[in-house]
Amino acid sequence: MTKNGVRSMNYQNQMKLKRFFRKPVVTYTFLGLQLILFLLMTIDGGSTNTFTLIGYGAKFNPLLVAGEWWRLVTPIFLHIGWVHLIMNSVILYYLGIQLEDTLGHWRFAAIYLLSGMLGNAASFAFNAFSVSAGASTSLFGLFGATLFLGKTYTGNPAIQHMARNFGTLILINLVFGFFNTSVDLAGHIGGLAGGYLMSTAISIPDPLPRWKKKRVLYGAGFAVLLILLLSIGYFRTLGAF
């Protein structure tokens, strides 16, 4: 093969790689992971079985207190029944294909995981007796990211439209959660706060000093809130059990 032929093949491979990474690969990865885990739980006792859920990493306060802190993250990828899985998967797909392109792959992944972790920490703090699972804490984190984008990019009509639509959806979900005891409202609010804080901390690549200070402040706020919620959850769980 000639040098020109090699260069042409290398160029084509580079373009294929670029096209691949333009796709919402993180969103697809998260969707695939939660589907695989759901199928495994279905085979291994059922996704609505409490013992199966706990075995696969659902949030369960006594085990968190015992040191299984990874349970702040694993519940994000577990779902209780087909309806729960389908609803959250549709929302993740719809939000993911928009936000991952806007924020970038690693920022999107970080916001999704960290906001979910803060949401589960809030659930740990205020729902001591519940076994909980689901992507809702992270999805509310993505809602928080849309609010941040709407506040930041005031001159972008597409982002403003998206922020208004999701702002309405957030309000409806919070009101519904307030009147429905089966909804983990604390987890949703914690995820929403986490998404907004982390979006401010990591999603603006702006070198201006005012943004640098704001990013540090909001990042520190996230860390303080996480520690506070974990402390509340720890001592409340010890008292309850």
Predicted regions and their residues:
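N-terminal TM1-TM2 helical hairpin plus the immediately adjacent luminal interfacial "cap"
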Residues: 23-133, 181-183
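Hydrophobic alpha-helical transmembrane segments
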Residues: 27-32, 109-113, 166-167, 171, ...
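Residue-level signature of the transmembrane alpha-helical core
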Residues: 35, 113-117, 138, 143, ...
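Alpha-helical transmembrane segments that form the membrane-embedded catalytic/substrate-binding core
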Residues: 85-92, 133-145, 184-202
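Membrane-interface helix-boundary motifs at transmembrane edges
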Residues: 100-103, 154-160, 205-214
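Cytoplasmic-side transmembrane-helix entry/capping segments in multi-pass membrane proteins
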Residues: 104-114, 134-139, 159-166, 216
